[in-house]
Amino acid sequence: MSEIETIGFHYVVEAAGCDPEILGNADRIREIFLEAAKVGNMEVKSSYFFKFSPTGVSGVVIVAESHISVHTWPEKGYAALDVYTCGTKAEPEKAVDYILEKFRAKYAHVSEIKRGIEEDDDTFTHMIMTWEESLRKNGNGKG
């Protein structure tokens, strides 16, 4: 069976049981995302993060290959993540794993969307694969 050709990979991640202190810290999230871009072999172009009052952060890192974005709810230990990349150089799954580790997520629901699958000359579609993971069984990060 041959590999399906795609223009890009889009990871949509529901991260739960995350460290609320990290989720409420825009500067720390920026550091994590910039390093995640490196880990995922992406070229950073720009970034912007906004801290809401009293809590929560929204932010984006623009990479040459597309973007990494987040919206957090520290009071719920929840983060909504998107990692989208085009081309063959980037490794978005490594960026996702790095972010989940640094957020200390205990649980993740991940959808991988292969985008831009060409059906014919003018038509494109996508394919979705979804999985769930229990990442940590206790609070110290060890299974």
Swiss-Prot record:
Required cofactor names: pyruvate
Single annotated GO MF: adenosylmethionine decarboxylase activity
Claim: Lyase is one of the keywords in the record: yes
Catalytic function, reaction form: S-adenosyl-L-methionine + H(+) = S-adenosyl 3-(methylsulfanyl)propylamine + CO2
Pathway(s) served: Amine and polyamine biosynthesis; S-adenosylmethioninamine biosynthesis; S-adenosylmethioninamine from S-adenosyl-L-methionine: step 1/1
UniProt entry keywords in alphabetical sequence: Autocatalytic cleavage, Decarboxylase, Lyase, Polyamine biosynthesis, Pyruvate, S-adenosyl-L-methionine, Schiff base, Spermidine biosynthesis, Zymogen
Residues where Pyruvic acid (Ser) is found: 66
Annotated site (Cleavage (non-hydrolytic)): 65-66
NCBIfam families tied to this protein: SAM_DCase_Bsu
Function noted in UniProt: Catalyzes the decarboxylation of S-adenosylmethionine to S-adenosylmethioninamine (dcAdoMet), the propylamine donor required for the synthesis of the polyamines spermine and spermidine from the diamine putrescine.
Protein known as: S-adenosylmethionine decarboxylase proenzyme
Protein's organism: Thermococcus gammatolerans (strain DSM 15229 / JCM 11827 / EJ3)
